[in-house]
Amino acid sequence: MRVLVINSGSSSIKYQLIEMEGEKVLCKGIAERIGIEGSRLVHRVGDEKHVIERELPDHEEALKLILNTLVDEKLGVIKDLKEIDAVGHRVVHGGERFKESVLVDEEVLKAIEEVSPLAPLHNPANLMGIKAAMKLLPGVPNVAVFDTAFHQTIPQKAYLYAIPYEYYEKYKIRRYGFHGTSHRYVSKRAAEILGKKLEELKIITCHIGNGASVAAVKYGKCVDTSMGFTPLEGLVMGTRSGDLDPAIPFFIMEKEGISPQEMYDILNKKSGVYGLSKGFSSDMRDIEEAALKGDEWCKLVLEIYDYRIAKYIGAYAAAMNGVDAIVFTAGVGENSPITREDVCSYLEFLGVKLDKQKNEETIRGKEGIISTPDSRVKVLVVPTNEELMIARDTKEIVEKIGR
């Protein structure tokens, strides 16, 4: 079975074509700057990279170019579009309705649209990708895989906010959590590496990228996560503030005379590492490099960043009444021995012992255990693979309906 995985953003479509037998990526790429001047397709087959400059006014045109490239004589990897058996889509928000991945039909499309106010930047773009695929590949099943679904096992005590309950009833304001597909993939993979059953383990997964979140995965089910009603809550991120006294935005708005939308943009786009570093960078690589060269302010930014992660790990160890493994993933989690070492230095009370050499070596796509053999809690690095998880779900659902 061949599955086309699509991640449709507001001005881009990322894609991978995966041969499910052997789980091999045949090609991948991105159509970027959709609806903006300078749009193009970057298409990769193995180590080869091809760039096609083309005007892409909308998502349908972008997907059309992607599909044409897949069957192109020179650049293609298949002879006919009929070789695509199914399409798997990343959908950011499934609200309370979707607890697992689903086959897309008219009812599902309507439901995704209904929860769009909860993810106004993402869901409408995800929908455009689904609708384009349904139009351009008629008869091919489409599956929606939700970022929020894995977190739907979180109990009420962890997802309800201490605000008037009527706001939950009226507007469904609660903790939803994000990065669910990544947390699900790395917790499952960590159990495989440890040679244990996922259902027997208490795992804390740390998805640390430009956006970042921690999840408590108890016996295979998520019981808490750091992102909340939106992806703004929790850890210090590239440009997002993470946890904040709710009175602070009101105070700033009053003092600066700014609107709620402007305040929202500040918290989402100008805060986090970028805000703390006084606009120096939102990229942790730049912060680490400056800190290593002796920049005292960047050292402090690093400390704030790592301290918040460690605090959440400690909290989730308490939430699960113990922890067997801690997993680092995503851009920073997979490639920053500095952050991993600093975070783990706070966790010695849990019995965490890091193997310095393994920590230094496990970067750039490598996976493995980076704690010492006598560490009470195992620490792992697992490169995330959300596309593969989407493809697996798609295959499973399509096989069930016997397509």
Curated annotation (Swiss-Prot):
This is Acetate kinase. Belongs to the acetokinase family. It catalyses: acetate + ATP = acetyl phosphate + ADP. Optimum temperature is 90 degrees Celsius. Signal peptide: none annotated. Pathway: Metabolic intermediate biosynthesis; acetyl-CoA biosynthesis; acetyl-CoA from acetate: step 1/2. GO terms for biological process: acetate metabolic process; acetyl-CoA biosynthetic process. Optimum pH is 7.0. It comes from the Bacteria. Mg(2+) binds at N7, E386. Its main location: cytoplasm. The keyword Metal-binding applies. InterPro entries: Ac/propionate_kinase, Aliphatic_acid_kin_short-chain, Aliphatic_acid_kinase_CS, ATPase_NBD. Its cofactor is Mg(2+); Mn(2+). Substrate binds at R90. It is an enzyme of class 2 (transferase). The active site is at D147 (proton donor/acceptor). The record marks H179, R240 as: Transition state stabilizer. Homodimer. It comes from Thermotoga maritima (strain ATCC 43589 / DSM 3109 / JCM 10099 / NBRC 100826 / MSB8).
